[in-house]
Amino acid sequence: MYDYNEYKALIEEHLLDYIPRIDAKAQTLFESMKYSLTSGGKRLRPVLLLAACDFAGGNIYEALPFACAIEYIHTYSLIHDDLPAMDNDDLRRGNPTNHKVFGEDIAILGGDALLNAAMELMFRDFTYQFDNPEKLRRHCRAGLIIAKAAGVNGMIAGQ
């Protein structure tokens, strides 16, 4: 495959599929998450993950949740980066930033929710792999590597 546009289209098609279902009282939070996730972007990080998987002979559909999780983490970091306490940006990708649309409180919670959704996504529904311990080990290791890269000694410290 090795086609940027095909990988990007696959990610765009499934990006919202993995957002946890939110009840009515949290609808504004969901809208905040969706707003920033669907505001465009090159999707370079998840595309690179799918391309590397494909190149190594892996199944890109098994890697798709990890690709979406990486985009959730990236989007969370952009929401928080735009906040008044950080860079205080009014625009992101030509659109009003999340905190300008939803307020600082919802923007913070929306970013936090995306980070948590990413972690949940990487570690959910993989019990089917218990019959394949090596695959389960790789799955858990990949999630741990991503979590560490996003964590206090990774992306957060870089802010």
Predicted regions and their residues:
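Double-stranded RNA-binding/processing signature
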Residues: 1-4
